[in-house]
Design a protein with these regions (language model features):
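A conserved regulatory-domain signal marking ACT and ACT-like small-molecule sensing domains
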Residues: 1-82
Length: 82
C-alpha cells in the first residue's frame, strides 16, 4: 500500500567537521526514527550533502519538531525534510 507516511528523507548540508553527522544520527535516534539509509557526498568547500532516509512510523515527535532539532545542530547549514 501507500507507505509514504512511514518514511521520510532528510536532505542536509553539513559542515565537514568531525561529529556533525553523528550529532544528526543521535537526534534521529532520540526521536525514535529508524534509519534506513545514509548517503553522503564528497565535501565541496568543506560542505557535504547528506541524504538520510528514515522510518518515522514509531517516531516520538512530529516531523516539524525533528526538523527543528536538526536545524539546531552545530554544523548543519540547511536541512529539508520530505
Amino acid at each position: 500500500g501507500d507507505d509514504s507516511n512511514d518514511t521520510a528523507t532528510i536532505n542536509a548540508k553539513l559542515m565537514d567537521n568531525a561529529g556533525v553527522l553523528s550529532s544528526l544520527m543521535a537526534e534521529l535516534y532520540k526521536a525514535g526514527a529508524n534509519v534506513l539509509s545514509v548517503n553522503q557526498s564528497v565535501p565541496i568547500h568543506s560542505v557535504a550533502d547528506v541524504s538520510v532516509t528514515v522510518r518515522i512510523a514509531e517516531m516520538a515527535i512530529t516531523k516539524k519538531e525533528l526538523l527543528n532539532s536538526i536545524e539546531k545542530i552545530d554544523g548543519v547549514n540547511s536541512v529539508v525534510l520530505s
